[in-house]
Amino acid sequence: TLITSYDFRILYALKKQNPNILRGFITLQQGLSITKKNIYENSPWMVKNYPMEELFLLPNIIKSLEGHVWSTFYRDVTKQNVELAHKHGLATCVWTVNREQDIIRMIEYGVDGIITDYPKKVQEICKAKNISWF
């Protein structure tokens, strides 16, 4: 079982109740017009207040909370953060990746999962570019 949430406090409390449940931390640092971000200084979504410089290293925070999956908005991810997440044993999943160049970039970054509105498109891109990602 994997439970994911934007609210780190819920995931932290869940760990105390049942440490065997896998927990995924959903993050959004760049505000979208339709969605409010949850990662910012003094965010009520976080377990505690983190200094701004730590918020750029979310895999460190998720690891410290003994998370299992980092699920982030694809525009917030960097190759370095994916590598850091993997170093901590975290799977990385990005959302909502729909454009070809973004899909290819996420695969090149080494993410473990892509959430998209067009799964067939991801398959076709991988096949056309001879990328064995599945």
What is each stretch, according to the model?
Residues T1-F134:
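Short loop-to-alpha-helix "cap/lid" segments that border enzyme active sites
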